[in-house]
Amino acid sequence: MPASWPKEYRAAADFVAAAYRPEQDEAGLETIERAADRVLEETGIRFLDDPQTIDVLKQAGGVATGDVVRLDGAELRRVIRRHAPAKFLLRGRNPARDTPVGAGAPPVFAPIYGAPNVVLDNGAREAGSRRIYGELVAAAHAAPGLTNTGQMICVMEDIPEDRRPLEMLLAHLSRSDKPFMGNIASPAAAEAVIDLTAAAVARPASAGECNLLHLINATPPLTYWPNPLKCLRAIALKGEASMVSSYMMMGATSPVTVAGALIQGYAEVLAGLALAQIWRPGAPVVMGILAYPFDMRRMLPSFGDPASQLVQFYAAELGRRLGVPIRGDGAITSAKIDDAQSGAEGGRVLSASVASGASFILHASGWLEQGRTVSFEKFGRDAAALAELGKPTEPPPLPLDRDIETEICSRITRL
């Protein structure tokens, strides 16, 4: 467990956040679940070009029409609750860096994921490269506030695509001994990184433990593409963890309302979470439902909007009702530079994730321009702020003897 987030700080954060959580809105949560069940039963989920997934879902009771499978949401929840662990250990090369993920554990913080562009400390703007990637991994390792070094912190534009998974793996293993995330470029790449990471960690497989967490995204609305489906299968069969997420643009790829986005996103992730358990009961999973308003004038998402924070709070509660760890987003922003806008928007999103009880917070440092850019300056500032979140405070002074205090006060009065 990270030294900067001892148990008492998780408990304190939970106490403060309890006032904002919708756990008392039992009727609202049940309405979302029932509406998602209706979406699954009447509309279904599209599983593109993956007959294996469709076949296994049919065996589990799904009704397939082409690549669309209609599902029983209540049964999916039963599968998830029966098999998915509420907590698991994410291992690093250094056992002292191992991080628990899930119920009662501190949040895990990982940096931005997937930025093609980089802004250096001197303000120069470059495409991502192997050299820069190694520097970002080293920065994540040196930051006490980041307990996971992530994956694809920037895109290695100077490296051929088929080499990037192993180049990133080498950077994470050689520049850090913290846990990191797995690669999903292809099922073969995922398996290769899993096997090589297991060799580097050099510890036997153990129930409730894994070496990598992989980002598996649905494609809203109500679709899974072939590569995430095949990667999910390969990852689950290897006993590694998947973070099954729906990342929606409200008004573009999902309904514009908070409730509508929650219903759609919950239907999407239920299917993915249950699939992992069908492939391998007990496979570690994390649930993510994230939605951001879409600005139709600029044709870009608006990060930091309060609507997205409501989605986070309800998504976290839905995840707790399933009994699985929950994803949150970190200091994400629509700002182009690291300014007051980026601080305000990023701070709101990060605060909502922490207060909601999120177990794994992605994009916790470095994010600019709707995620198209990683900034070294913002990376360092965000990481420093994360370290302060769990920094122990000085204990109060020992109480002064009452008689001495009275004597001093009386002398002051006489003066």
Question: What is each stretch, according to the model?
Answer:
Residues M1-G28, F88-Y113:
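N-terminal basic/disordered segments at the start of proteins
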Residues G102-G104, V108-I112, I132, H141, ...:
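Short juxta-domain linker segments that transition from a proline/glycine-rich
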Residues S359-W367:
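Short acidic/histidine-rich active-site segments
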Residues P51, D55-L120:
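Glycine-rich, N-terminal phosphate-binding loop and its surrounding beta-alpha-beta segment
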Residues A124-A355, S359:
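Helix-rich catalytic cores of soluble enzyme domains
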Residues A17-R21, R298-F303, A331-D338, G366-K378:
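Short beta-alpha connecting loops at secondary-structure transitions
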